[in-house]
Curated annotation (Swiss-Prot):
Keywords in alphabetical order: Iron
Family that this chain belongs to: Belongs to the Fe(2+)-trafficking protein family.
Name under which the protein is recorded: Probable Fe(2+)-trafficking protein
Keyword Amino-acid biosynthesis applies: no
GO biological process terms on file: cellular response to oxidative stress
Organism superkingdom: Bacteria
Any one cellular-component term (Gene Ontology): cytosol
């Protein structure tokens, strides 16, 4: 049986993640407050950020940027798309 959470992004009860996505306090918060659907939305947004900003995830600075954007995406004012970004349909 899947667990449900009140998703902070979708503002509704939804299926929760099966496990904590990464270690630490932020990982616990995501596990407890973010739904599987919202997490998948974030993964798509994160991929777009990595590609558009040409982030190298070996660099600590790039990983910290993504962590900050994730906090904004779920718990803050939201993570914006890069200026000039055009979505391919």
């Amino acid at each position: 049986m899947s667990r449900t959470v009140f998703c902070c992004k979708l503002k509704q009860e939804a299926e929760g993640l099966e496990k904590q996505p990464f270690p630490g306090e932020l990982g616990k918060k995501v596990f407890n407050e973010v739904s599987k659907q919202a997490w998948n939305m974030w993964l798509s947004h994160q991929t777009m950020l990595i590609n558009e900003y040409r982030l190298n995830l070996i660099e600590a600075r790039a990983r910290e940027f993504l962590k900050e954007e994730m906090q904004k995406y779920f718990f803050g004012e939201g993570s914006d798309k890069p200026s000039g970004y055009k979505e391919i349909k």
